[in-house]
């Protein structure tokens, strides 16, 4: 069965309780083809409080092989401060 990029998710549930531990809020397909680049907005659940934390971003690369996507690499942006530093650097490098 062939898989579509729209089916990719990073949500994770606890195997024992079925409770969501990583909640996907949004996603963007950055590049399509045999190698897909995607950006996900997500929240982790705090194991102690049970509450979801501040939104984070994960950039991921998937390789499509025999109709399915295999995760090949990822980079997580841990919070607003790191995102702002990345944005500032990209603006400087690309003069935007």
Segments from the language model and where they lie:
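Positively charged, low-complexity terminal tracts
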Residues: 1-84, 88-96
């Amino acid at each position: 069965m062939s898989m579509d990029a729209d089916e990719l998710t990073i949500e994770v549930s606890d195997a024992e309780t079925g409770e969501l531990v990583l909640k996907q809020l949004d996603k963007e397909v950055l590049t399509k083809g045999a190698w897909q680049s995607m950006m996900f907005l997500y929240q982790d659940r705090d194991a102690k409080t049970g509450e979801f934390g501040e939104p984070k971003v994960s950039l991921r690369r998937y390789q499509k092989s025999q109709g399915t996507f295999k995760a090949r690499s990822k980079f997580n942006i841990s919070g607003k401060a790191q995102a702002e530093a990345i944005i500032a650097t990209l603006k400087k490098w690309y003069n935007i």
